């Protein structure tokens, strides 16, 4: 890589990076990371892995379809019918394509898919080999090449997307935003993102203590074959509690039992060993207790040995297990066969499912028991369910693979059924017709569209909310949504443990960004530099270990295990090694050279427990760290210099990893490294804190996620405030994407004059917050002025608002399509006329053009018609003279929302997937800040606008500066958002200095004292206070006031969208009470608590009015004799109660309609409520 003379320029000492140099150097390293990876790389890589590896693997793993007709006994001699074998082989994926109605394929661009409500998917083809075997003839092989089997939705910006690798200019020509990160799908025109799902890691042994159950301790192993369709099979090894109901009068002591898959009862552990073929006690103990010099442990196993004393042979043990199976066999042979199957295929499948894996399984089972005993003896800590090393994240790849596997299985089933029909009739079948392509296409589309992850027919078992509509409110909310993690624990559970911030989340998951309320701590977000492993094959590592003198389990004597180190690969025990130190060094060296071992593999050496664990599986969360050797960074100046020139010399992050100065460390391995926070810690001091550092953080601010990285000085705020801002930053208005004018989003807010903040963090440049900001630098004073800013409200400058301060535009799209309901009902876009059209509302239809659509530029207000559409009324058979019907059509137009007004911005007419006419109309309205709108600073300080004063009524400084916003001093002390104040100071300095201020967290170079000194250099008060003059009187305000520029955001909650009142309006059909909700012009509920207040006041008439007259007044006629509602004909004034034959003694009772309904419903249940009139 370097020439000899190039090396000469750097001396050994010269090349070291000093702490001062590091202030800038670390950001060069971080920039190179983001240049290469971007922010959604984990989504894209996972999807690419699915397309390139998983699909092919799933197709190859499927067994060939073997078909044969029933033998025909027609002509005396039995002729063996031909056998057909179908094998699916190589797969091919084409570019995303769309077939028009005329059948011509054309490449589909993502924006076209969004606008026309199509699915952005690519066709999948497969080679099928069909073999015909006839008796006495040689085999006939036919190749069906590239048979279409379905469409797979494509993730935007992944390798197979049409946008992959295009320049910014090309993207703009395709109406795509160059800043859009991709990482989502387009299904029926809406953008869907797959949320990473958390799960416990498979194939690892966990030991937990059990509370209040018959077991004291339980060891479990969720065992699952890599890349197989089998569901995980879990095996539990448990130790019974002392003197519990399980221990037989506790004479025997604590027994150990195993719970096997498909076996109903628990089986004593020793019997399982005997069933595996280890009969003598010594053999079994050797596999459990490696060291016989351990009396305590021997004592623990003794009760289990005594219990299984009765059963001494393998077959007896197998019979014992088989007879407890799900459906026990009739004969002994069948039972034994069943037990053998369970032990071979279902117990610990990851160790092996082929024959002769008994030794390995016995060792693994023994290891599980050993772990259980260690925990029971208190020699090893129990496992932690919430440790992030024990968790795996299922991203798009594994999630889609799970779905595709199920769909493909169904496809094969259908092919088999179809082909068998033809073969039974003695005909050949057509493969193209046998393959139902809709199974895969619709199956994947259904799950991505609804978020129910699984088969459509079993929707109730499926996980909900795996796929969500991508949040497009602000650019930051989009990025954050693409990096979200979800724990599938019931939201209603009151468990605090899984919700708490675990130590192992440091650097992997953002500590601040999590929703408030019932999902707190269950929904998390990735930290900025965290990456999720894609998974790689363990085979090269296994081969390497074989060469490097690892002893295989089958070849060793059990006695050797006690002193050696066990080696696990992906949770499976593969062997032992005598020299772990050297092995680990070699493995690490290989990983750093990226030779044999991929950089995302993690290697953990647990010295205390004498174990080496190697993980290559997918879904481990890891992050890059700098490698330290001999207390010096391996990263040198020359690397930094090359990175600075990376645009010209192609030296990138990948080269940095390849040259072995950075490596990826996952959560488990992080616990075995010694981490320096800054290179400053590596300096030799008099009192060294530690002299064995192995790694160093790149920059501590990288522990934060997307939304928390926007906060200036988050290390000066009380922690919940950062959490609040992380949630509010997702609701701020800005420019959410640069191509918003060509998109037809259902809802969109765009700020008129967004500004980049004066005070920024260094992380912001990777979030593109400077290019797509969401807020304005406002002059903010902290004062109580006229008292219109109490309780978190703010006073705004009316004149600034008139000049465009925080003005925004709001877009809403309406869509409608013509579709054919039946053969005689068809929908048409047209302008309905009152002569021929039934059911027209009292609305203005005049604004429509003749084609039924409104023209752009027309001003519309609530309940105006935007899209005119009619549907033909079906002709009734009984009408003979149907020619002179008055109405032939029914109106089913689309109206503007009642509470909105605006101007039609854009009208789009096109054809949708079925070839029907389809239109989208976008209406825009200008939103000017007004009293009641919500604003917030970047520190969780939210407030609504309390009043707006003209500029001349606002206070002013001697320089003539008036604040845009005045907030109340009471907002600061109890909330301790000191970052807010420092930001204001820093902003003041920046405005004077003319350069952007740095507010990156954990940065010792910036502190309040330094900022204050700079401020006083510019002739201001040290702490930012100024003398203000009252705007009403012009007099000096007695106290000095803190004033300066602070970045404020306008949030999406606006008073226009929420204002609601009702006098009269629609009522519900069932109980005749007012409807609910603003959109339906509903009433306001007078609830139980309000009722109680009125009772306490004794306001009886008011109570009657609210709960009766203003709600659902009704009157019924009641028979005075039996108290049940009577028949009343109010026109003829005749009343009767048939049961009592009473026509005279009837009273009129007024009651709420809901009460009458309740009485009648009770009557339908044979309960007769009688209303006796007094």
Curated annotation (Swiss-Prot):
Keywords of the record: DNA-directed RNA polymerase, Hydrolase, Magnesium, Metal-binding, Methylation, Nucleotidyltransferase, Nucleus, Phosphoprotein, Transcription, Transferase, Zinc, Zinc-finger
Binding site for Zn(2+): 1119, 1122, 1137, 1140
Signal peptide annotation: none
Catalytic activity from the UniProt record: RNA(n) + a ribonucleoside 5'-triphosphate = RNA(n+1) + diphosphate; a 3'-end ribonucleotidyl-ribonucleotide-RNA + H2O = a 3'-end ribonucleotide-RNA + a ribonucleoside 5'-phosphate + H(+)
Main location: nucleus
SUPFAM superfamilies: beta and beta-prime subunits of DNA dependent RNA-polymerase
Binding site for RNA: 731, 841, 890, 942
Activity regulation description: Pol II enzymatic activities are inhibited by alpha-amanitin. 3'->5' exonuclease activity is stimulated by TFIIS, whereas pyrophosphorolysis is enhanced by TFIIF.
Residue positions binding Mg(2+): 792
Domain of life: Eukaryota
Post-translational modification N6-methyllysine, affected residues: 1052
InterPro entries: DNA-dir_RNA_pol_su2, DNA-dir_RNAP_su2_dom, DNA-dir_RNAP_su2_hyb_sf, RNA_pol_bsu_CS, RNA_pol_bsu_protrusion, RNA_pol_Rpb2_2, RNA_pol_Rpb2_2_sf, RNA_pol_Rpb2_3
Subcellular location, record wording: Nucleus
Cofactor: binding details: Two Mg(2+) ions are coordinated by both the catalytic residues and the nucleic acid substrate to enhance substrate recognition and catalytic efficiency.
Documented EC number(s): 2.7.7.6, 3.1.13.-, 2.7.7.48
GO BP: transcription by RNA polymerase II
Residues that hold DNA template strand according to the record: 456, 1078, 1085
Cofactor annotation: Mg(2+)
PANTHER family xrefs: DNA-DIRECTED RNA POLYMERASE I SUBUNIT 2
Function, as annotated: Catalytic core component of RNA polymerase II (Pol II), a DNA-dependent RNA polymerase which synthesizes mRNA precursors and many functional non-coding RNAs using the four ribonucleoside triphosphates as substrates. Pol II-mediated transcription cycle proceeds through transcription initiation, transcription elongation and transcription termination stages.
Assembly with partners or alone: Component of the RNA polymerase II (Pol II) core complex consisting of 12 subunits: a ten-subunit catalytic core composed of POLR2A/RPB1, POLR2B/RPB2, POLR2C/RPB3, POLR2I/RPB9, POLR2J/RPB11, POLR2E/RPABC1, POLR2F/RPABC2, POLR2H/RPABC3, POLR2K/RPABC4 and POLR2L/RPABC5 and a mobile stalk composed of two subunits POLR2D/RPB4 and POLR2G/RPB7, protruding from the core and functioning primarily in transcription initiation. Part of Pol II(G) complex, in which Pol II core associates with an additional subunit POLR2M; unlike conventional Pol II, Pol II(G) functions as a transcriptional repressor.
Similarity-based family: Belongs to the RNA polymerase beta chain family.
Name this polypeptide is given: DNA-directed RNA polymerase II subunit RPB2
